[in-house]
């Protein structure tokens, strides 16, 4: 018989830097999960990624207080900011442009995020990433 699901917890945790402090501790503590066990497992799974990169994670908590988790790819906005070398997007994206990304960088980001994105082809995924870039005040160069 399958385990009974108690809750799903969605968090963004820095790769390789999960610790019991907020937001991880309170979110998992409410569900009765062993927080240190999650932190060790998450850090082990994300050790190959760049340290500090925010990684979305969905934690499935079961009625017997055990858990499983699925890590996703970093948000497109974070990858775009890293590619453009900027700290934050524009407050007025249509007026103030804050940086540039090339089509090759957009393709690379789309390929990185391919597993977590909808869209039939890499081109449709690239259009989605390019739209995110424009909404952040980045210019997409061909």
UniProtKB/Swiss-Prot annotation:
One of its GO terms (cellular component) is cytosolic large ribosomal subunit. GO terms for molecular function: large ribosomal subunit rRNA binding; structural constituent of ribosome. Gene3D superfamilies: Ribosomal protein L11, C-terminal domain, Ribosomal protein L11/L12, N-terminal domain. SUPFAM superfamilies: Ribosomal L11/L12e N-terminal domain, Ribosomal protein L11, C-terminal domain. The keyword Ribosomal protein applies. One or more lysine residues are methylated. One of its GO terms (biological process) is translation. Keywords: Methylation, Ribonucleoprotein, Ribosomal protein, RNA-binding, rRNA-binding. SMART domains: RL11. It comes from the Bacteria. The keyword DNA damage does not apply. Coiled coil: none annotated. It holds the Pfam family Ribosomal_L11. Part of the ribosomal stalk of the 50S ribosomal subunit. Interacts with L10 and the large rRNA to form the base of the stalk. L10 forms an elongated spine to which L12 dimers bind in a sequential fashion forming a multimeric L10(L12)X complex. HAMAP family: Ribosomal_uL11. Forms part of the ribosomal stalk which helps the ribosome interact with GTP-bound translation factors. Belongs to the universal ribosomal protein uL11 family. This is Large ribosomal subunit protein uL11. It comes from Haemophilus influenzae (strain ATCC 51907 / DSM 11121 / KW20 / Rd).
């Amino acid at each position: 018989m399958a385990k009974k699901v108690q809750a799903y917890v969605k968090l963004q945790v820095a790769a390789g830097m999960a610790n019991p402090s907020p937001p991880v501790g309170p979110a998992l503590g409410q569900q009765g999960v062993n927080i240190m066990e999650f932190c060790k497992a998450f850090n082990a799974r994300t050790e190959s990624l760049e340290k500090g990169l925010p990684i979305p994670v969905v934690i499935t908590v079961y009625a017997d207080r055990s858990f499983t988790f699925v890590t996703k790819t970093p948000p497109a906005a974070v990858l775009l900011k890293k590619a453009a070398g900027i700290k934050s997007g524009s407050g007025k994206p249509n007026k103030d442009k804050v940086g540039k990304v090339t089509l090759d960088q957009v393709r690379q980001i789309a390929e990185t995020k391919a597993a977590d994105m909808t869209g039939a082809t890499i081109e449709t995924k690239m259009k989605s990433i390019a739209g995110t870039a424009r909404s952040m005040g980045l210019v997409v160069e061909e």
